Structures are given as C-alpha cells and as structure tokens.
C-alpha cells in the first residue's frame, strides 16, 4: 500500500472513531430574545418541581417560571452568569449562560435586504443629482456669450503682435534714489 493511501485510510479511521465516541446527550441552548430595553431568557429544560433562576450564583426571588424577563436591562448592571435549575435539590441539572447584551430604547431591527436597498437607492439618487448638475452647468456654459479679456484686465493677446511694443517697466519697483543703499540692496552680490 502506498503511503498516500495509508494516510487517507488512517484519517478515515480516526474520523469514524471520533464520530462514534461523541456524546449522545444533546444540549439544548438557552433562547435569548432582545426587544427594546427588555431581555427574555428561556430555560432549555423543563423541571418537574419548578424552576429557580440565579444570577452570579445569587438566587433571583420572584422568578420561578421557564421564562425570565429582565425589564430595563443594563449592560453594566445586568450582565453576568445566569442559571436555571430545579427548585429542590438536583443542582447538577443547572444550565449556565453568560449574558452580556446591548439594548436601546428606540432601536429598530433591519434585515440585509433592507440595508442593501437603502444603499442602492442612495447611490442612484447621488448619481442622478450628479448628472443633473453636470448637464445643467453644460447647458449654461453653451448659452453664455464668450467674453474677451481686454488688455487692461491683465490679459495679453496670445501669439506675437508686432505692432505693440513691449510693456513699460512698472515705476513702483524702481529705486527711489539712484545713489541710496537700501536695507536689502547688498544681498546676493558676490561679484562686487
């Protein structure tokens, strides 16, 4: 037998042994229902003598039914280990659950389809507004009369204009007196 086949047979045998060795006792999980500020726990097992609830190993008085309703649930104060067990004796059959939940008063539950619909509609509306503004600005640009900039507005005609001489230097930047040395006149003069 090849080593590859040997490993496959060995793996299959281990898988079968693991499946046969599994515990047949089925554990029923707690049912937790959150609505607004209230949390409802359902004990996974029915006890004949009645049920008692414990939170952090302290008995909760007045809660003897299969359902435990926690009104005004607070994440900080109400979180902890919850147990439901038989009223008399038989503490071995206790089921323990660690509960930490966030609740809010005005929350609304939405499913995946509703969220996807909201996102797609938002994208479509945004693209529609974008196209509307684009075509509106394009049509406005076509209706506008072209404006030519005059020479006094800082614009020069493009290309060479042989009839116009070069502009006169601006007298604002000329030295005030020819022989006077200004504060910054000595900067960057290496050849002097």
Swiss-Prot record:
What are the start and end residues of every segment in region (Proline-rich sequence)? 164-171
Any GO BP: adaptive immune response
Membrane topology summary: Single-pass type I membrane protein
Pfam families under this entry?
Answer: Ig_5 (PF16681), ITAM (PF02189)
Domain Ig-like as annotated: residue spans? 27-98
Q: Which residues lie on this side of the membrane: Extracellular?
A: 22-111
In terms of SUPFAM superfamilies, this protein maps to: Immunoglobulin
Gene3D superfamilies documented for this protein: Immunoglobulins
Q: Which residues cross the membrane?
A: 112-137
Point out residues bearing the modification Phosphotyrosine.
173, 184
Q: Which cysteines are joined by disulfide bonds?
A: 43-84
Where located? Cell membrane
Domain annotation ITAM: ranges: 163-190
Signal peptide residues on this chain, from the entry's feature table: 1-21
Q: Where is this region: Disordered?
A: 146-192
Modification(s) after translation: Phosphorylated on Tyr residues after T-cell receptor triggering by LCK in association with CD4/CD8.
Cite the ranges annotated as topological domain Cytoplasmic. Answer: 138-192
Keywords, in A-Z order: Adaptive immunity, Cell membrane, Disulfide bond, Immunity, Immunoglobulin domain, Membrane, Phosphoprotein, Receptor, Signal, Transmembrane, Transmembrane helix
| Quaternary structure note | The TCR-CD3 complex is composed of a CD3D/CD3E and a CD3G/CD3E heterodimers that preferentially associate with TCRalpha and TCRbeta, respectively, to form TCRalpha/CD3E/CD3G and TCRbeta/CD3G/CD3E trimers. In turn, the hexamer interacts with CD3Z homodimer to form the TCR-CD3 complex. Alternatively, TCRalpha and TCRbeta can be replaced by TCRgamma and TCRdelta. Interacts with CD6. Interacts (via Proline-rich sequence) with NCK1; the interaction is ligand dependent but independent of tyrosine kinase activation.
Protein's UniProt name: T-cell surface glycoprotein CD3 epsilon chain
